[in-house]
Amino acid sequence: MASKERRYPEGKKLVSEQSDLNPTVSIIVPVKNGAATVQELLESLMQIDYDKNKLEVIVVDGNSTDDTQEIVSKFPVGLLKEERPGLNAARNTGINHSKGEIIAFTDCDCVVPRNWIKRLTEDFRNPQVGCVGGNILGYYDNFLSRYSDESILPVMRIFKKRKVLSSVKPPLQYPAGCNMAARREAIEDVGGYNENLMYGFDEDELVERICKKDYSMVLDPKVVVKHKHRLTLLELLKQNFQYGRGGGLLSKLEGTNSTFSRWILLCVSCFFLLCSAIAVLIFLIISAGSFISSVVLSAILLLPPIGLMVFYLRQTFNENNRGYKKVIVYPFIDIIRSIAFVSGAAYQLLRSVAKTEKVTQSGNSEI
């Protein structure tokens, strides 16, 4: 069992500037029951074009019950076991046992290109840069994977141009955990990942704290990994529901102190206001005395999906892509994804409130 105390190795030298243009890099891979995908990731990591004397790979296994550990042990990488639950406990354990000036993160369902680390380290040549994130593109060539990349709100991060920012900007201007890196001293400055966070928004919260320490953040579309997106609509909706739960938990823990928690609370509030407005419109349509009134009210109700259809029609036309199926289907998926996300956030917020009330009542009964 890894130590519960967050501690960095003694004698480790902190660097305010990298020693050369090729800093030492540690790649941290948290995994649990990843036997189906981890081998392909590790094979791609073995092909990385970077000085092997300055590169280490550390896989942190969270009590896998499949063949994950057996597969990982066949590769020349560090393998650690973490008994505490959660991605963040695994990530912190990997950080604690790493040596690199730059710490990169990816997941077991990703595949990285040979130039991944070179691209990442180039963005750290400015000592003010605390963290870097890049694009996560679909590994599979199927309809749902393409949707995940082409949606008006991509499932993963996709940046059109390189940006250097001083703060996170929801909903899209921040890195994702499967393709990001941070300077060691920046991670140490903020105390690592918050192990109380689960389900999602954990790396986002870390990046926000790093930026608040006056580090800058680089979003670079040339830093790319391939990700094995969800293969079914149900899996995608479950993923978005879990992301929403992560946002709800962050809002409970941080209140309005976090940019992300404020954004989540705004999303939940707007969602319920929209639902109320839709209910009123439906009532007015049903009770409308004239055909024209019903048509006008119905048109107002259909404005969001029609707007999305226009967006995807324009996207299809600009790309000279004849796949007009997406003009109809993508808006539908966008809407139910949004519902799943906000439902997850609302569920977690309500659950947290109920748990707090239960604890309070229990405490009062003991007085």
Question: What positions do the PLM features span?
Answer:
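Glycine-rich, basic loop-to-helix element that forms the pyrophosphate-binding segment
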Residues: 82-98, 170, 178
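Conserved donor NDP-sugar-binding/catalytic core segment of glycosyltransferases
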Residues: 115-146, 228
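A conserved acidic beta->alpha catalytic loop
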Residues: 44, 61-69, 110
